[in-house]
Amino acid sequence: MERIDKIIASQGKYSRSEVKTLISKKRVTVNGEVIKSSSIKADPNTACIVVNGEELSFKKFVYLMLNKPKGYVSATEDKNDKTVLDLVPLEYRHRNLFPAGRLDTTGLMIITDDGEFAHNILSPKKHISKTYNVTIDIDMSNDMVLGFKEGVNLSDGECKSASLEITGKNTGIVILTEGRYHQIKRMFGCFGAKVVELERIKMGNFSLPSDLKMGEVREFSSLELEEVVK
């Protein structure tokens, strides 16, 4: 059981002070009964809560996918730059959202308020793969493919085995199961190459939807979320 104002505010559409105002105006009902106090408690999973004429669909956590564009940093706040949270629709802004991991380039990013889920998809022990399209400034080579497979030795230690599939003269697909700082750029740097373009296109078995435009955000379905952790 939780306080009714906390339940409603947790869903992001209304702040806690706004909820209290709505309650004072008799705009909130629980199981058909008008609520007169914000301290009333209810079970968010079973109670029928109606706010301003709209039934509340309770979600303990939200999971958002973002097709991250350039020019936004993977942080909750930044004094100098725009953050990925600036792209989140207003209806989610009251939730304690954060980006699940860093993405310094473009592509698929997960934004959530579920800390345990974020930890699980980022933990190297879980072996959840991340797939990237990459373009470099020189020709791809079989030496790179072999080096990625054997494990590139970086300044902070040897990388786990990674996959590099050559798709063009200077393009390829990289699959990692760990996420070090600027890892792909540093790995190609060991072969004298500079990464020109880098886009994350897949996490686990979930691919970036082709209809999700750059900068757009939408919620995961439960089935899509399962694909991430497979």
What are these regions (language model features)?
Residues 2-230:
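Basic, flexible Lys/Arg- and Gly-enriched helix-loop patches that mediate nucleic-acid binding at interfaces
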